[in-house]
Every structure is written in structure tokens, then in C-alpha cells.
Amino acid sequence: VILHAANRLHSIALHNILILPDFYLPGTDTKINPFAKVEPVRSVAARIIRLREIGQTIGEIAGGEAVHPSNPRVGGMYRNVTERARMKMFDLAKEGRQLATDQMEFMIAILRNFQKRDYCVVGNAKVPMPKELGYHNQGYMAVDPMYGTNSLAEYPTWQPQRWAESRPWDWYMGEMEIDFEDPSYPIGGTTKKGGKANPQMEACTGVPTYDGQPVEVGPRARLVKFKGYDEKGTVGQHIARQLEYVDCIYAILKSLDALNTSGKVLADPIPQGDGSMGWAANEAPRGTDVHLARVKDGRVQWYEMLVPTTWNFPTCSRALTGAPWQLAELVVRGYDPCVSCATHMIVVDDDNRIVAQKLIQ
């Protein structure tokens, strides 16, 4: 739980940096540049950076690596932390408590200000702001406020029999001609007209459903399922994420208080598997992350991952329905999708000199 909450704390702070340019300083028509050297933005950026440092440091102390650890230990951890390390994590979490509260309140104020606006400037256009931006009527899926569940739990909160998966070919539209372009759209204009797009062929993930329908996973889903949260739309999604700031800190403090630094860290024995399916559903920062496997005699026979962004893609497409196309990116960023928004490709020669580069979006 400590590693998990630290990772989520770091993720929320990073997402703040990504979304702040979408919004305005209250009382102005000035969009926020999180890297500007003027107040209040400079202090906000410093706070975000410190929250990321706190999350990463606690994660490294507790689990060896904060994000995407390269050497996981099946069945537990390699070693326990020392009492000194436990107290270090306590100190970091206590420092983060006020920072997280301040950042949560700042972000909610920014979001509420944006919600009151009549328009948003994108490129050279004043785009009317729909009051129902990002709304959808899909359900929500979450298995735990902070951690997760699995097939060995007495009362598992996820059921594999309710899950199904479709091919992109069966879900998305076929080939269409691009017949519109806007060179003023940031950055560098939209895709040139005259080309073709084919989501059926270009989509690279399956389409998972739960009870036959796409679902939303992530911060809002957790708050809907476990805390009675009910705000819809893109702003509601962003606010839900900010509300998890303080949850992360208190989850860390509570777990550190209960941590026995002399306790066992590895399951004994570790089952070698009989070929039947087992699964675990974990609440990652972006949402429910389900791993399913069949293991027999210590060897993996079959493995499948249902990651948060895969769950959210079809729901996000429903949330985009009816939105001004200029605000589509804003809606998508509410889901914090784990995909590359752009790839900076460089070509170097034998002397490591850049001979060509291109930004692929």
C-alpha cells in the first residue's frame, strides 16, 4: 500500500503539470504556463516538483523503484525496510500532507474557475464551453479505494465472468476521408485534408467491456464506488483526481504506523500453480489494472493484462460525442491515457551528432 500510494501521489502531481496549460489564472484570460518564472505559477510548480520528489522517494525506499520496477519479486519483497527508513518515510509523508492539501485546493479553484467560463481560446478561435463537456452515460468500475482484490480474496470485488473483449474491427468505424483542416490549431495545425483514417485497422488495443458495456476506471470511478462522488464531465473527472491527493498521504501514514519492520516479506510457500486461472485487480493511478494468468508447475501458460487506458478508450470516445472538436484533447487528458501524445525521433551518426530529427504526433 505504501508503494502504491506513493506512486499515485507522484502520478497526480505529474498530471497537474500536463493539464495546467489547458486552464486559466482566475480572473484573467491568461492560460497557465507551469514553467513561467512569475508568481503564483512559480510557487505552484515548486510545490508540484516537491510532491513528485516525495512520492518517488517514498516509493524507492519502500519498493526499490517508484514506477515500473524492473526486478519485481514474485510473492512479496526482497527485504523489509529498516526502522530508520520507516521514520524517513514518515517525515516525508508529514511534509507532503500540507503540500498535498494546498495543491488540491489550488487545482480545484483553477478547475471551478474554468467551469464558469463561457468560452475557451484554442489557436485563433474562441470555442464555446459546453456545460456538459465530457459527459457520458457509461458505468464505473473500481475494486478498492487504494489497493485491490484478487481471486483468492474471500469476497473479491471483481468478477472475470462479467468481462468480455471485442476486436477494434467490431467496435470502431471504418475508413473515412479527412475533409477538414485547421492550420491555426496548436501546434502546427491539424492533419492535412485529403488523407484517410481507418480506426478499425489503426486501433491497436482490444475493447474490454464489463456487463456488456464500456466502463470508466480511475479516480472518479473510485470516488463514485466508495465515497458517493457524483460529479460528471471532464471537470468532475479532474476534481476527483485532486481529491485523491490527501488520500494518498493518509494511506501512507496509516500503513507506516502499522508496518512491522521485523515482519515477513515473502509468502511461504509460493504456490507453483495447477493450471487454473488466477487474477488480481489493482487500483493503479489511472484506474483498475487487471492481470490474469494460468500457471502450472511454476511456468506461465497464459497471461493477459487489462490495463486502465484500455478500459477507458471506448468510454472516452463516448465522452467525446458532441464536444467541440477543438476541445477533444482537453477531454482526453481527463483520462490521463497511458499513450504517447508525440514522439521526438532523432537520427545520430557514429559520433553521436544529430543529423535529423522529427516530431511525430
Regions inferred by a protein language model and the residue ranges of each:
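Active-site bordering "gate/hinge" segments
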Residues: 1-286, 296-297, 309-361
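Short beta-strand elements
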Residues: 289-307
